[in-house]
Amino acid sequence: MAGAELRAALEQRLAALAIRTEVVEHPEVFTVEEMMPHIQHLKGAHSKNLFLKDKKKKGYWLVTVLHDRQINLNDLAKQLGVGSGNLRFADEAAMLEKLKVGQGCATPLALFCDDGDVKFVLDSAFLEGGHEKVYFHPMTNAATMGLSPEDFLTFVKNTGHDPIILNFDKN
């Protein structure tokens, strides 16, 4: 499926769950820094997404944190019980295979494409921060989609993923 078809499939899935969204179209962006000028007016929690690989078990992890978080992969690996030094950024081919999105498009909204190979880690600040909306790319890095934290969790669980919720403020 191409990007437009994947986005339409995502929108259909969200509609089937009666999840309302707000979408802002913007130029294609590849980093949080490029994205923020286009969406900083949107009130809520903006995301940074890391697609990682566990070098020992060959497992995949999608880690979604607040956009301004700095993540130490060794500390994260210890928290996840995979051992320090065992998490690496996965290559684009793996992301395309597992989530059907490429570089700059990593998003938890792509979890509906995963067959259960990707573990999902979510920053607890998305759920505990009192945010009206949480924002992610809708299968394209030329748009940003907002939905309520409750609806987001409903969507994630509907994909068959039980998020590992971590408090990154403790690090």
Swiss-Prot record:
In its UniProt record, a GO molecular function of this protein is: aminoacyl-tRNA deacylase activity
Q: Which Gene3D superfamilies match?
A: YbaK/aminoacyl-tRNA synthetase-associated domain (3.90.960.10)
One Pfam family it belongs to:
tRNA_edit
CDD domains referenced in this protein's UniProt entry, alphabetically: PrdX_deacylase
Q: Which family does it belong to?
A: Belongs to the PRORSD1 family.
The name on file for this protein is Prolyl-tRNA synthetase associated domain-containing protein 1
Q: What is the lineage of its organism?
A: Eukaryota, Metazoa, Chordata, Craniata, Vertebrata
This protein's gene is called PRORSD1
